[in-house]
């Protein structure tokens, strides 16, 4: 054990619980900062925007130290600035070595943050590949743009 590893042993169970609580609070603060919400840390969740609430949910998911984060339509209802903030958070999550699975209709976001994309049309897989491959795929163009114009 290192110097701080047994500090809770000297104070008994209550000291250990306090040390763990302090660690959890510090981790929560770090994750709130990580998703860009440091300025609203003390606000009630009912007073922050829906985009900020989604970022807070991402921070909450990250608190469990997962290997995979699943984001189901995280950009729904977001304006361009909020989508850009979300894209930056997703990129930083990936830089931490976490896998991110995004289900999303906003193709700009998908093209920006994903290395590999699977495209579904009415529940059927019609394409899979890198963003640049998906953008040129005739089945994707037909399904989502109604053909080449």
Task: State what each model feature region is.
Residues 1-149:
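Glycine-rich phosphate-binding loops of nucleotide-dependent enzymes
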